[in-house]
Swiss-Prot record:
Gene this chain is encoded by: engB
First and last residue of the signal peptide: none
Task performed by this protein: Necessary for normal cell division and for the maintenance of normal septation.
Molecular function terms from GO: GTP binding; metal ion binding
Family indicated by similarity: Belongs to the TRAFAC class TrmE-Era-EngA-EngB-Septin-like GTPase superfamily. EngB GTPase family.
Protein name listed in UniProt: Probable GTP-binding protein EngB
Length: 220
């Protein structure tokens, strides 16, 4: 059975939650597939989500990095969701608040069984900071595939861009195919089609495809 293409333009806001406990209170259960977006507070997560869904304000962007403190959930369909995790690592955020965010991120990655993939966004000019590597390690420990998305790729010339992409791929080479690395620009649309292809693949794990097919058979 060939997998259908998810229409990411249909994404709609579902809920916000300050931590995993509140998330579990609002969701119908740890079911379906969630794809999480994580990154430093100035990595461009909100802009990336808006571009990928063709919606100008699905995820709120802020000129003040660190403003987004909640876990925000967007529904694609009854079985699939996108998750905008709190930005991490911004220097001007109070230490206590920064610690709380990191605890929420850790809890989410360790406890959500439906997490089917994680996009770690990094400024292509400053990739692989300590917290970026920690997020990647957390995901891989939970056997979650990772897309390292090098944002703001339009800031570099083509040759410089590919040089940085190759350097990051080499650095993450020990993880084999569990980590994909792609350049991306919300401003110029660089990498959009490639990213949507990866997300679509993550949205179709075999167990979910089989479950949907079984449900359709029972309804006939």
């Amino acid at each position: 059975m060939s997998e259908s293409c998810i229409d990411f333009r249909k994404a709609k806001f579902l809920i916000s939650a300050p931590d995993i406990a509140h998330l579990n209170e609002h969701l119908p259960g740890d079911a379906g597939v969630e794809i999480a977006f994580a990154g430093r507070s100035n990595a461009g997560k909100s802009s990336a989500l808006n571009l990928l869904t063709d919606q100008k304000s699905l995820a709120r962007t802020s000129r003040t990095p660190g403003r987004t403190q909640l876990i925000n959930i967007f529904e694609l369909d009854e079985n699939r969701r996108l998750v905008d995790l709190p930005g991490y690592g911004f220097a001007q955020v109070p230490l206590a608040l920064k610690k709380k965010w990191q605890e929420s991120l850790g809890e989410y990655l360790q406890e959500r069984q439906c997490l089917g993939g994680m996009v770690v966004l990094m400024d292509i000019r400053h990739p692989l900071k300590d917290l970026d590597m920690q997020m990647i390690a957390w995901a891989l420990e939970s056997e979650i595939p990772v897309l390292a998305l090098l944002t703001k790729a339009d800031k570099l010339k083509q040759s410089e861009r590919m040089k940085m992409v190759n350097e990051v791929r080499k650095h993450l080479g020990d993880f084999d195919d569990r980590v994909k690395v792609e350049p991306f620009s919300s401003l110029k649309g660089i990498g959009k089609a490639k990213v949507l292809g990866i997300l679509n693949e993550w949205c179709h794990p075999q167990w979910l495809t089989d479950a949907i097919a079984d449900a359709e058979t029972e309804e006939e």
